[in-house]
From Swiss-Prot:
Main location: membrane
Protein name per the record: ATP synthase subunit alpha
Single annotated GO MF: ADP binding
Species name: Corynebacterium efficiens (strain DSM 44549 / YS-314 / AJ 12310 / JCM 11189 / NBRC 100395)
Subcellular location: Cell membrane
Annotated GO CC locations: plasma membrane; proton-transporting ATP synthase complex
Amino acid sequence: MAELTISSDEIRSAIANYTSSYSAEASREEVGVVISAADGIAQVSGLPSVMANELLEFPGGVIGVAQNLDTDSVGVVVLGNYELLKEGDQVRRTGDVLSIPVGEKFLGRVINPLGQPIDGLGEIVAEEDRVLELQAPSVLERQPVEEPMATGIKAIDAMTPIGRGQRQLIIGDRKTGKTAVCVDTILNQKANWETGDKTKQVRCIYVAIGQKGSTIAALRKTLEEQGALEYTTIVAAPASDAAGFKWLAPFAGAALAQHWMYQGNHVLVIYDDLTKQAEAYRAISLLLRRPPGREAYPGDVFYLHSRLLERAAKLSDDLGAGSITALPIIETKANDVSAFIPTNVISITDGQVFLESDLFNRGVRPAINVGISVSRVGGAAQTKGMKKVAGSLRLDLAAYRDLEAFATFASDLDAASKAQLERGQRLVQLLIQSENAPQAVEYQIISLWLAGEGAFDNVPVDDVRRFETELHEYLGSNAPQVYEQIAGGAVLSDESKETLLQATEQFKGTFQTTDGTRIINEPEVDALDAGQVRKDQLTVSRKVGK
């Protein structure tokens, strides 16, 4: 049996190492206790050093955001299943302010407001974390909005143009096509994305707030089928989620957008819709016992939307010249744009596109009321070619609306009024577009210019849209150089105008209307003078009664 030897030097060395690493200082950890938990809100006692918007950790991995910082308790918005919490549970500080992971890999994915994937396609590799409540760019960090953000919708691109870095409100009653306008705008960015040019490409973020899960799934399917999902991220806070997720979803979309903007990219963010976010924030505020104001909204609901939408900007060249274009959606009731939330957001944004249920029900889609829709950026965000042809369009349509109202009471109209009425009817038809069918700017310019020149005046009203579609197919084969010229940013030259008019007249000879006839331009005949009439050759026919 081996002899046991003990080295006193080794024992002394081990004790010395242990005692030298020992610290007499006690570690401090703040721990709170749940007083109550109900309706997505937890009241927590303790945590005297907690920060506003700090993440707190509950048992079972549930997290919350500190909101009300009272002297003896903290009001916490629970981001998860609050039913798992019970009185007496311990709550720990994390020291982190609410943030989400961001990065290029988020394109093509569906995430929740915490940046976690919910599409079943696996984890997302993030580049970094970005704070949700980030400060908007200052005045000196911005530059004027001058680059167009084409939507592919003639009525918007011509009369209420949107520029990169602008905030344009889409407002209207439910079921008037608000989401369709925004989805078409996303689809219209496909051609720019395929160029591979960073200065042309637009990354899109669609924030779905309080919508049905089936609606979000259908939208994702549409984007995927149209080839637009590869440059789009969907931030989803469906109706089944807690109010806290609906409140945070727009800020998550804005944080992801700012990450790309500061890299010099162009981003389009759609908030669908901010009415539901305001309602969720109202519910949270009332549950936190904050004093209600107008329509029971809290006093800082204006600040809720202003600090979100101010993050949309066109950055200066020194910061990379990136941009965020915001399209917030607001749902009205009975076309009442004077309600609290609509007036708030109208005052924050750079213009609004108003969709009207009456127009929608009459088949005018997109149902844009051009009378009260406006863009405060205006022609600065239009190409030269579009600015040239769209100048009189709004006036022509406004005059048509007035004349249309008058014509319902007047029995006789003079020839000029009749001509204006008929052209207005054709302009309205020309501005109607199918869903998920955005139109390139060069096609819009050619259609609007030809309409202004009277090329559609003798086309039956019911055939205007089909005539336009088939005309573009014909012009694409017979005058492709005109499309290339406009796409390059040039205005229509006199030679191009002549080419378009001649080609249109040739096409009219082949176009067949719905009733099977052809469009024939009858030559103008001058009236005969009295001396030219041969009275002796006139034949008088008399109708003889039976």
